[in-house]
Amino acid sequence: MEDSTTKNIKEIYLAGGCFWGIEAYAKKIYGVIETTAGYANGKTENTTYRELHSTDHAETVHIKYDADKLSLKKLLKFYFQVIDPTSINKQGNDRGRQYRTGIYYTNPKDREIILQEISEQQKKYTDKIQVEVEPLKNY
């Protein structure tokens, strides 16, 4: 991971199965400054691992990145390399709603970039991409 001396720090939240795998992968990407594993976009503001089934949060990684070194588009291309975007509520051996795929944004301008990348990725699959795209509600 890079140091955080840059002024152009952006953030995105990525859900893609167990958060430990996504986090470990993201840490190796040039331009990523910081990663944090947590739970996002559930029915309640906060949750715990034991409450996941009732609160409907997704295991998610908060990624801060230097936009001068790494674009959101490029970061999303890396993300799509390590998930199965056509599966619903599962990745690999991990099964359940908490393992769903999702891209959660805090900057409304990111939505268009995300949807463009999904459209681009869809060309690689016959099945429909099932990745949630939503504003971040909670983390």
Per-segment meaning from a language model:
Residues M1-Y139:
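Flexible coil/turn and secondary-structure edge motifs
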